[in-house]
Amino acid sequence: MLGNGLDILYNLDIYFHPRTNQSAGFIEGINHVRIVNNTKDELKQLYFHNASNYSASKAPLTEISEVRCSHTGHISGQDSLVLKIGLFPAVKQGETVIIDIPFKTFFTSSGNPHLPAYGARKDTTTYNAINFYPVLEYYYTDGWHPELYTKSIKPYTQFAQYKVDLTIPKDFMVGVSGNVIKQNELETGHLKYSFKDDFTLSCSALIVQGMHKTELNISGVQVEIIAPKTQTKRVQKTAEHLQALIPFYEQRFGNALMDKLVIGIGYSLGTHAVTNGNYIIFQGHIDIEHVLDHEMAHQWFDYSIQADEYRDVWLNESFAEYASWLFAQSQKDEADPFTFTDPLPDINIWSDIKTMDTEDWTRFLMDVIGEKSLPPVYQPGKQINWETVANIYSKYIVGNHALQNLQATVGDSVMRNIMFNYCLLFKGKTTNTEDFIVVVEQHSEKEIADNFRLALTTNISPDLEIKNVDSQFKHRQWHNQIITSFEGSWIMPVDILIITENGDSTLLKQVDIKTNKTINLATSSPAVSVILDPRKKLFDDNRFNNRWPRRVSLQPDYGLPSWETYKVYYRPKLKRDWRGNWRTGVKFSGGLGINLMPIMPAFYQNLFDFEITFSIGVPKHNWGGKINYRTPLESTANTFWELEKGYEYPKKWTKLSFNNYFGEPKYLAVQGESYYSRLTSTISSTEYIASDSSAWWTTGQSVKLKEKWTIFSYSATQRYLVETHLLYGFQEEVSFYNFGISADVETHKFEGFIIRLHSEAGFVWDERAGNELDYRLLYVPKVWQQREGRIPLFRGVASDEKEWHDNILSGGVSVGFETEAAAWPMVYIDGAIISDKKGTLLERIDQLNRSDKVYISAGIGLESQTIMEIGLYFPVWVSHPVGGEDNFTLRMLMQWGFYF
């Protein structure tokens, strides 16, 4: 669906207004658009993208007043992401349509990388003016595709000509993405800049105060670096880096559509770097290393050559990764073209979590837990919505690896010709994967091109093996003959490690075993070990396309997810069971999965938990356990099912749950906020083989149906959880019910403090002899926010474990001083009102209001805020329940994982 046929001119007359005490900063003006229809079809409507109006639930950031058009028709969507203009009469081939769109766009500090951003630090202020004006949507060869235009906040448009007049206050400095042709000082104390760009995808401007501009010319490109004066050394290093980087890219890929480049500093970007045509802005400081190389490569692969599908990520990200890898190799004394995984680095990113987007998380995961830990492309198999981001990860990396392996296959010089001619052929055009594969075939052969396509899209397990090794002593040397074998249609050059009887080792690099299945090597002693692909380079490449891993490992649960193998984790268990007895044992967990909720989506297939425990305090029937299995439904995008079966004498149970997510969940790494609304439907069967002397439960089987609705939100400064549930059950024709609602809020909006609020109400209707369904009150503070079934929820105050109640109303508040390592002290007060009165819901609420059974607890606590989460709490009872725990009884909670 390559786009063509429209000649577009944007003539922007705009004015910048800085932030004041009365209003937020904004940029306003008129977008004069001139479109010539060179297609064979009539244009009956136009679609314009307004990135700032991306959210239907929030006030629009771009206000559009009366739109004027030479072919006036119905106009709609002024306050939405897509503005639609009907054309009457229709614009025929060769005709021109002129549109004037007055707009006013406000800057935001929301942290969305695609929106115009305002930020201030110390004596510096920045306004990152990107995507601030209505821009024409992409026009395909088969016409408009309005169903695609709402899929992305970032505009997806076509190349056009820009002429811009920008007026700013005199005390501001500006860097613009086009070439400035005129600069005037107005009588009003403003500066007016006139600039243009004859062929580009976007227009951007960085407007700042308190910064310094460094200008230089590199290979004919006018470069402006805008940064605080405190970063003078970093700017100098950046300039030196660009002196090598830009000529290298031009040598390898030809000239980009870039005769001007602005590199600057911004705040509230929502990511470490924002890139548009001729324009790169970094959050806080310029990253001279890999990020700059990667973002600079986007001037070739994204803004000079555009993918014809906005979702075809690999043509932008993988090519940029490959380009930055090429440059990194050129800076080494000895290039190592096939080292994909670096050792585990010592880094600390926790303070930067709130500014990390999908690309940042990809890079972080590669650094911290190795490339083996990134999700594969799911081919073939069901594609569910949550796996979309996994595809982004995998294409980001798989494409880069495939390009590197293509280079190893065809050779450096041929690969250089492939890349240079591809860039030359599609400069200023749109392209797709097949276009690149055609270029590969033109410079190599059809088999290589076909194999490259396979490397991107399918499961290609080569299954390397050594069939035989024969060592014979001749002429005072050992002659070793190594016969290899493989399966699969594509085999890359492979390293071979030979170890001899004397302990000597020889590494043969990049052996083509496809054409040379037999390797002959002379050594001083016989070979005792031969290893194909010792550093698992081929496995690294193929692993990304394998839905199922090829190995199983058993290791401790240290909290880091991985896709390298089907890992089985084990960890010791020590817990108090449902009867209050201590149990110890071991828990095994495994599956294909990565779960960093709520920072990132939860991708998983076929997860399981298997637990075996023994009760220390029970002389007989003291063993038990459970198994839990969960995976997505094959037919539903946002539904996951879970099956659990367990036994702890005298209780055995079976539970089947369906977790239904309403709408698309949000994730902090992608959208700056984690949010989901989930309905969990659970049907369970519980049987007691023997009764309890205290009449807690009776023998027999009960069946329960429970509906629980959960709303969860997490951001950098505030998080909340609201839950309500209704349980219905029956046992021997006797029905029983349970209803509850709770709300928890945690805020970090006050610098240096954590503030938490909790409230809960619960009611039980149960006429059975036992009291299994009633509320049992235990003091468990809500130390951490909910994380997919792992974090305990606050549930009131402590009481005797055998004392049961039908109605409860509880609430609490805690305040603590927050540091990077710990929250100390956490001062809290919690209370509960209970009642055993029967009746309707309104009668029970009234009885709670009259009840004199009020328990209040106060105390102090300590919480760590590191990857190892520990909470220590010491309650002091203001009104002590009968049989309750002693004052200052230590409550400790501990968990390994990501702190929320």
Describe every region a protein language model picked out.
Residues K229-I482, V530:
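Hydrophobic alpha-helical and helix-loop surface patches within well-folded domains
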Residues I448-A449, P462-P534:
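Beta-strand-rich binding/interaction modules
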Residues I867, N887-F900:
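Outer-membrane beta-barrel "beta-signal"
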Residues P102-L206:
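Extended, low-hydrophobicity, Ser/Thr/Pro/Gly-biased non-transmembrane segments
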Residues P572, W641-Y647, N659, Y667-E820, ...:
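C-terminal outer-membrane beta-barrel translocator/porin domains of Gram-negative envelope proteins
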Residues V494, T500-T506, Q510-I513, I519-P526, ...:
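Outer-membrane beta-barrel initiation region
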Residues Y54-T124, T188-G189, K514-S525, N542:
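A surface-exposed beta-strand-loop module
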Residues M1-E28, A449-A455, R571-K575:
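N-terminal, polar/Ser/Thr-rich
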